[in-house]
């Protein structure tokens, strides 16, 4: 009895020690949260606010994230088979709210979809109201880019939804090849993918491309009431025009945003608006199109856009100086009829400099209070490439209550990394996703970071 009593005492003492440790850790996190400010990493997510995931002991890059109704995160990107860049697959991972992989999804939280013999890159993801996951991108033969739109739908458990397209996969072929960069849902459940279509492809030279949109019925079949058999393409000035983002307005109109170029101003921000049947809306901009130059023969490209409740469109991307020495985050805001909004930074556009070369914003988010979050990174040209975030006030000035002077830089280590996508949680926190190189094998992993935002 004395031995049993002694063991029970040791157990009770050990239990009290564990309980005390748990209380201390809880108090530590609580104090951290109480002292935290908007833009700080969220210590309740992953390790100190960061998560890295090796999907295949190869090169993995996360491109986009979507939030489920239950708070879980769906992250999509590409993974290379044995680091063979001609054999990329769609990769999807789902995370619990604390940043751990959700083992109820796919195999230990991960799904891989192969397109045999093709380089396949998913660019965007959206969650349907029924929990199904729609991923859009492209698949092509390496160095030819003679590929197609690929739209894949997964069941909530990560299996392919065989009621959609051909075994869960829809392939849309445009002339000369195409690629989807974004996807969105209409209120009626129809799916719109947007990207680029090659009109004339010249390897090693400047190609002729147009904005490309495709709309699908709920089962993945083309919507014949949209454009020409479910497809629309739009030319700006006969050169390289690419749509990177697509929005649906409450009135059913569709806005595509990206870049267009000509010999005079080189690449500019570009936007086009369509009626619900896919025809150009001539009440927007000039003949349904808008171009915005950030000065001289710059390389300016919009990568993401968001729609304000008042109908104004915010676009973000990058602007490169004429001599190529500096590339900054670039943001433009348009009125509902496609004119630069002069109440935003006096001329409708602004740039954000993080102090090093070659920064690009890849995602824009709108807070409920009207403030603007831009997320991105550098272009892999130095070991100083990090996740970059900035917050703007409604009129375009940096919000100095966010991070340091309105800007946040997050490093995962001394090697290259950057953010490609972001989303808000229901509590306002920001989740950014991208990639991070590792010392272990010099390849890259999915990288996630979560930030506090009181909005």
Region spans (language model):
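Extracytoplasmic mature domains of secreted or surface-exposed proteins
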Residues: 2-3, 17-18, 27-455
């Amino acid at each position: 009895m004395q031995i049993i009593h002694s063991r029970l005492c040791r157990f009770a003492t050990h239990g009290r020690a564990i309980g005390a440790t748990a209380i201390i850790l809880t108090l530590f996190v609580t104090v951290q949260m109480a002292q935290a400010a908007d833009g700080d990493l969220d210590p309740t997510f992953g390790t100190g606010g960061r998560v890295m995931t090796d999907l295949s002991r190869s090169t993995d890059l996360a491109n986009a994230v979507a939030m489920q109704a239950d708070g879980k995160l769906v992250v999509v990107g590409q993974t290379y088979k044995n680091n063979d860049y001609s054999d990329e697959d769609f990769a999807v991972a789902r995370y619990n709210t604390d940043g751990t992989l959700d083992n109820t999804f796919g195999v230990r939280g991960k799904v891989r979809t192969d397109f045999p013999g093709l380089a396949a890159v998913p660019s965007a993801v959206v969650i349907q109201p029924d929990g199904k996951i729609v991923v859009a991108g492209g698949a092509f033969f390496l160095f030819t880019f003679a590929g197609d739109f690929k739209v894949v739908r997964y069941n909530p458990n990560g299996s392919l939804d065989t009621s959609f397209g051909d075994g869960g996969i829809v392939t849309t072929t445009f002339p000369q090849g195409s690629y989807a960069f974004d996807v969105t849902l209409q209120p009626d459940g129809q799916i719109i993918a947007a990207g680029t279509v090659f009109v004339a492809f010249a390897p090693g030279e400047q190609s002729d491309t147009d904005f490309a949109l495709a709309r699908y019925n709920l089962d993945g079949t083309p919507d014949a009431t949209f454009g020409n058999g479910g497809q629309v393409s739009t030319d700006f000035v006969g050169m390289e025009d690419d749509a990177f983002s697509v929005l649906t307005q409450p009135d059913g109109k569709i806005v595509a945003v990206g870049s267009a170029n000509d010999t005079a101003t080189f690449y500019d921000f570009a936007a086009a608006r369509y009626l619900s049947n896919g025809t150009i809306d001539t009440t927007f901009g000039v003949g349904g199109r808008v171009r915005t130059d950030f000065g001289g023969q710059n390389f300016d490209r919009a990568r993401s856009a968001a729609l304000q409740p008042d109908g104004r469109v915010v676009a973000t991307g990058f602007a490169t100086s004429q001599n190529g020495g500096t590339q900054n985050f670039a943001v433009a805001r348009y009125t509902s009829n496609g004119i630069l909004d002069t109440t935003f930074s006096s001329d409708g556009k602004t740039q954000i400099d993080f102090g090093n070369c070659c920064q690009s914003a890849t995602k824009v988010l709108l807070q409920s209070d009207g403030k603007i979050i831009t997320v991105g990174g550098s272009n892999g040209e130095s070991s100083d490439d990090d996740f970059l975030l900035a917050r703007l006030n409604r009129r375009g000035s940096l919000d100095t209550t966010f991070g340091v002077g309105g800007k946040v830089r997050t490093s995962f280590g001394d090697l290259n990394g950057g953010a490609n996508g972001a989303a808000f949680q229901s509590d306002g926190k920001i989740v950014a996703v991208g990639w991070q190189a590792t010392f272990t094998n010099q390849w890259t992993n999915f990288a996630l970071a979560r930030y506090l935002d009181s909005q």
